[in-house]
From Swiss-Prot:
Upper taxonomic lineage: Eukaryota, Fungi, Dikarya, Ascomycota, Taphrinomycotina
Biological-process GO terms, alphabetical: diadenosine triphosphate catabolic process
Compartments (UniProt record): Cytoplasm; Nucleus
Species of provenance: Schizosaccharomyces pombe (strain 972 / ATCC 24843)
Residue numbers annotated as active site: E41 (proton acceptor), K114 (proton donor), C156 (nucleophile)
Main location: cytoplasm
Domain named CN hydrolase: residues: 1-254
Protein name per UniProt: Probable hydrolase nit2
UniProt entry tagged with the keyword Cell cycle: no
SUPFAM superfamilies the UniProt entry points to: Carbon-nitrogen hydrolase
Catalytic activity, EC: 3.5.-.-
GN (gene name): nit2
Annotated family: Belongs to the carbon-nitrogen hydrolase superfamily. NIT1/NIT2 family.
A GO term for molecular function: bis(5'-adenosyl)-triphosphatase activity
Length: 276
């Protein structure tokens, strides 16, 4: 078994403050013996509005954020999965990206951009149009090799599409990560149900680092970072209401993945519906 660390954050509009928190959590995770740490969506910042998001994405502090996290991965000898905003080739558009950083040289070995964007209007809740600022990703990437096993990348709203989880499992994933920033309303109704469902669909561990708490006067996130095993059991959940930033841990056992897949083989009828 191998120890995984999952971070919960309450990111603000200050990239450097968020960076300091991330570096401290990397240090804490490594000190506990974790081999890999996972951070939520928008670890670098959560902006007040679209204009600020574009401005911050192109600010030099964003480059420093990634550079310093890479250095921390090397310093503490730990794999890091972190989500950031990145400039795109289209003016006034950004990419919502999940980066895997290896600890030997601090190299980025995988860069996934969110495929499904969050464009919703919630009655008595927020209206969010991610497509106003963000380009959707155009690829599902092969799972990344880590000390925990092969980890497939998805981000937040991707969780509502079981086809992506099944695709990642078919590409060899033992684990799927869903770094997220769910709204309080959708989180309370759907968060745990979706995480457990994707674990059952794919027969993978599901790792779900989350943003939690009030970010600014317009935005708050649900929190409740979780780790779910391939049987659909929640084996760790962030519940420290006294601290908006912190860690949860769990030992991941790939033998359990094999056991679940052997015990309940999912023999698909691809003569009746398309192969994913």
């Amino acid at each position: 078994m191998t120890l995984a660390a999952v971070a919960q954050l309450n990111s603000s509009g200050s990239i450097l403050k968020n960076l300091a928190i991330c570096k401290e959590l990397i240090s804490q995770a490594a000190a506990k013996g974790a081999k890999c740490i996972f951070f939520p969506e928008a670890s670098d910042f959560i902006a007040h509005n679209s204009d600020e998001a574009i401005e911050l994405t192109n600010h030099p502090d964003c480059s420093k954020f990634i550079r310093d996290v890479r250095e921390s991965a090397t310093k503490h000898s730990i794999f890091v999965n972190i989500c950031v905003h990145e400039p795109s080739k289209v003016k006034n558009k950004l990419l919502n990206s999940s980066l895997f950083i290896e600890p030997l040289h601090g190299e980025i070995i995988s860069r996934y951009s969110k495929a499904h964007l969050f464009d919703v209007e919630i009655k008595n809740g927020p209206t969010l149009k991610e497509s106003n600022t963000t380009l959707r990703g155009e690829a599902i990437l092969p799972p990344c090799k880590t000390p925990l096993g092969k980890v497939g990348s998805a981000i937040c709203f991707d969780i509502r599409f079981p086809e992506q989880a099944i695709k990642l499992r078919n590409m060899g994933a033992h684990i799927i990560t869903y770094p997220s920033a769910f709204t309080e309303k959708t989180g309370a109704a759907h968060w745990e149900v979706l995480l457990r469902a994707r674990a059952l669909d794919s027969q993978c561990y599901v790792i779900a680092p989350a943003q939690g708490g009030k970010h600014n006067e317009k935005r708050a996130s649900y929190g409740h970072s979780m780790i779910v095993d391939p049987w659909g059991t929640v084996i760790a959940q962030y519940s420290d209401i006294s601290s908006p930033n912190g860690l949860i841990f769990a030992d991941l056992d790939l033998n359990l993945v094999d056991h679940v897949r052997t015990y309940i083989p999912l023999l698909r009828r691809n003569d009746l519906y398309p192969t994913i």
